[in-house]
Amino acid sequence: MGCFHSTAAREFPDHENPVKLASETAFSVSEVEALYELFKSISSSVVDDGLINKEEFQLALFKNRKKENLFANRIFDLFDVKRKGVIDFGDFVRSLNVFHPNASLEEKTDFTFRLYDMDCTGFIERQEVKQMLIALLCESEMKLADDTIEMILDQTFEDADVDRDGKIDKTEWSNFVIKNPSLLKIMTLPYLRDITTTFPSFVFNSEVDEIAT
């Protein structure tokens, strides 16, 4: 958990105490305070209501409020812990914690499993992996032939689906990740280790600030 000793932790009206959030995450109090500045910037980019809606989240992640993106939608759904269609500051900090370099392998593995388990069945199915792969390729502007995508899916399930039931359960996914740690690269944002030295450059992109002004 983060170092949460502070003599002058700021209070954020209508939001959770930074000391409390630091005690529950890998962030220090000063890092939580820096995250609050980021949260304010994102949450006011479209509607200034102290909450992050899906449009603001997509704008922060991908600089584009018009283009729907499955990956962004899934991340938003996982951040939206209370299922209200918006993200409050507490959920924002706790959810970002899984991307911290000090977050455990277990936390990161669980998050990626839920990311791919789009139907919330407790299993990752081939079509879910295909949808996510296509979404990630589109976002990176990479193009792969359909047969290449199918080959990737075949190899993934050959390696991960140990009991050959056509789906990947949590145990199979955990073992697959251990053998293929590169799968978790997206789950670590190094600058989360000390946001206070990188803010305001720590932001998914700088366009949020430009739109807010």
Swiss-Prot record:
Its main location: membrane. Keywords: Abscisic acid signaling pathway, Calcium, Cell membrane, Lipoprotein, Membrane, Metal-binding, Myristate, Phosphoprotein, Repeat, Stress response. Residues 31-66, 67-102, 104-139, 148-183 form the EF-hand domain. It is a lipid-anchor. Induction: By drought, cold, salt and abscisic acid (ABA) treatments. Both N-myristoylation and calcium-mediated conformational changes are essential for its function. It is found in: Cell membrane. A lipid is attached at G2 (N-myristoyl glycine). The modification Phosphoserine is found at S201. SUPFAM superfamilies: EF-hand. Pfam families: EF-hand_7 (PF13499). GO terms for cellular component: cytoplasm; plasma membrane; plastid. Belongs to the calcineurin regulatory subunit family. This is Calcineurin B-like protein 9. It comes from Arabidopsis thaliana (Mouse-ear cress).
